[in-house]
Design a protein with these regions (language model features):
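Catalytic histidine neighborhood in serine/cysteine hydrolases
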Residues: 260-278, 291
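Conserved alpha/beta-hydrolase
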Residues: 104-124
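Alpha/beta-hydrolase active-site loop
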Residues: 128-149
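Catalytic active-site module of serine/aspartate enzymes centered on a nucleophile-bearing elbow/loop
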Residues: 283-302
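An N-terminal hydrophobic leader/cap segment in hydrolases
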Residues: 7-62, 72
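Hydrolase active-site cap/lid region
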Residues: 169-223, 231
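The serine-hydrolase catalytic nucleophile loop
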Residues: 90-104, 117
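Short beta-strand/loop motif that positions the catalytic acidic residue
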Residues: 235-237, 242-244, 248
Length: 302
């Protein structure tokens, strides 16, 4: 009798953990239900006026797994070989994440390509890629913009939050020589590490994470363990500027030091005092612009 009770209890516990893990995966990774479009972030009146005067082209590619992915392109005012590819973060969309950055880069003569990540904005997709699937999409966008302009380019990849993880994960792949440098703002070391941190912060039982990791490959198309930013960064040959706020509790600040130390390419590090997650530019735009400019000038011809 006791053996039957133990067996039944074990099976029931396993079922509950498995079901709870699937619920946790879907909560973190499933595309959110269509909500009212979030307003653009932290725009001044001058920013709003400037933005209202710009014309954006709409571009589209098909991902390797058949999704229609869409992007906005803001062309430079004059002939230019400089392109910024700007990758937004989790539960955001292209223009919302980068509206306050656009004028800075545009005034420097950049064409600016802003994709909507899979399962975000105008792009298709049921599950969020957390940078791992997006790294391949990012490389497709690089090739698409090369074909669009049909010339040699100087490409800078800029990512914020999950977008930062995307460009860093892409850096571990073979990138075209047109990619000159990366600006990485508040990226995480791996999907597993970020999930672990968020579970702890949200008081979700950590026992769910190993099971969720086992189930994630089948559920969302990648394992939380394999989706490692830090392992990709170790392979990177692309000069990278790492930016992080010292008050970030969503992607904890220690992660940027781990990423910086793992990077064997040319690199620099900016820690912005008083900045929470994805707030570095908002807290200190002058410092961020100065540091980005100095870094880019080493690798991009102006």
């Amino acid at each position: 009798m006791n053996k039957k009770i133990i067996a039944t209890t074990t099976l029931l516990s396993g079922f509950i953990i498995g079901l709870s893990s699937i619920i946790a995966i879907d909560y973190a990774c499933k595309r959110p239900k269509q909500r009212k479009e979030k307003p653009l972030k932290n725009l001044s009146k001058d920013n709003e006026l400037w933005l209202s005067q710009q014309h954006f082209e709409e571009l589209e590619i098909t991902s390797q797994d058949g999704l229609k992915l869409r992007a906005k392109l803001l062309k430079a005012n004059e002939e230019s070989d400089k392109v910024l590819i700007a990758i937004h973060g989790y539960h955001s969309y292209n223009l919302r994440e980068y509206a306050y950055y656009l004028q800075f880069y545009h005034d420097l003569g950049f064409h600016i390509l802003m994709p909507d990540n899979r399962a975000h904005g105008e792009s298709e997709g049921k599950y969020i890629g957390f940078g791992w699937l997006d790294r391949i999409d990012c490389i497709q966008w690089i090739n698409e913009i090369k074909s669009y302009f049909n010339r040699d380019l100087q490409i800078v990849l800029h990512g914020i939050s999950m977008g930062s993880a995307t460009v860093l994960m892409a850096s571990g792949e073979e990138l075209p020589s047109d990619v000159k440098c990366i600006i990485s703002d508040c990226g995480f070391t791996s999907v597993y590490d970020e999930m672990k941190h968020e579970m702890k912060r949200s008081h979700v039982p950590s026992i769910l994470l190993p099971t969720a990791t086992l189930l994630s490959k089948r559920r969302v198309g990648y394992s939380f363990k394999e989706a490692s930013t830090i392992e990709q960064v170790k392979k990177s040959k692309t000069p990278t500027l790492f930016i992080h706020g010292d008050q970030d509790d969503f992607v904890p600040t220690y992660m940027v030091y781990d990423l910086y130390n793992a990077c064997k390419a040319d690199k620099d590090l900016l820690i912005v005092e008083g900045a929470k997650h994805a707030q570095s530019y908002i807290v200190n735009p002058e410092l961020c612009e100065k540091t980005i400019m100095e870094f880019m000038h080493k690798y991009v011809k102006f």
